């Protein structure tokens, strides 16, 4: 029989002892606002030199407070999962701030041995032509607001959201994966060489 968890939730809200805490500094040129609470979730909005971005974070028992140029993430629960989520939330907030302040950049390389690969951007896709001599082009989706710049054999994925940039770079790498061939011999493809 399942026990009533109402008392556990109530004790989380009324407890004053902090078991895990992380403080994230907010730079002067970044404005960070917060809405919500631990039950409904928090919506954080960051505005900086590179633009604006929002992030929704929710985990009952993990609290976020903004003030005096700092973001305080803490939990009043002694459970491991709650303590771990404090670090996760702090990491997401740091990425949110870094994105609007400096932005993120992934650097990829186009590698081929015999058939020259042609890469171009078309709308919200990257078209990869003549990959290992294939007649039909391969396509990789550009996620969200990420921007792709192609310069010879170098591809740069830039943006303010690390998840959008990372997924776009992964899409490019996955689109040129050769199946049922030894990767030590068939090394053609697009590979991530530098991450933020």
Curated annotation (Swiss-Prot):
- Swiss-Prot/TrEMBL keywords: Ribonucleoprotein, Ribosomal protein, RNA-binding, rRNA-binding
An example of a GO molecular function for this protein is: rRNA binding
Keyword Lipid biosynthesis carried by entry: no
**InterPro entries for the chain:** Ribosomal_uL6-like (IPR000702), Ribosomal_uL6-like_a/b-dom_sf (IPR036789), Ribosomal_uL6_a/b-dom (IPR020040), Ribosomal_uL6_arc (IPR019907), Ribosomal_uL6_CS2 (IPR002359)
Kindly give the Gene3D superfamilies that the UniProt entry links to this protein: Ribosomal protein L6, alpha-beta domain
Tagged with keyword RNA-binding: yes
Offer a single GO CC term for the protein. Answer: cytosolic large ribosomal subunit
Q: Which GO terms describe its biological process?
A: cytoplasmic translation
Record note on quaternary structure: Part of the 50S ribosomal subunit.
Q: What does this gene product do? A: This protein binds to the 23S rRNA, and is important in its secondary structure. It is located near the subunit interface in the base of the L7/L12 stalk, and near the tRNA binding site of the peptidyltransferase center.
PANTHER family found in the cross-reference section: 60S RIBOSOMAL PROTEIN L9, 60S/50S RIBOSOMAL PROTEIN L6/L9
State the similarity comment: Belongs to the universal ribosomal protein uL6 family.
Give the matching NCBIfam families.
Answer: PRK05518.1, uL6_arch
Q: Which protein is depicted?
A: Large ribosomal subunit protein uL6
Origin organism is Archaeoglobus fulgidus (strain ATCC 49558 / DSM 4304 / JCM 9628 / NBRC 100126 / VC-16)
Protein's gene: rpl6
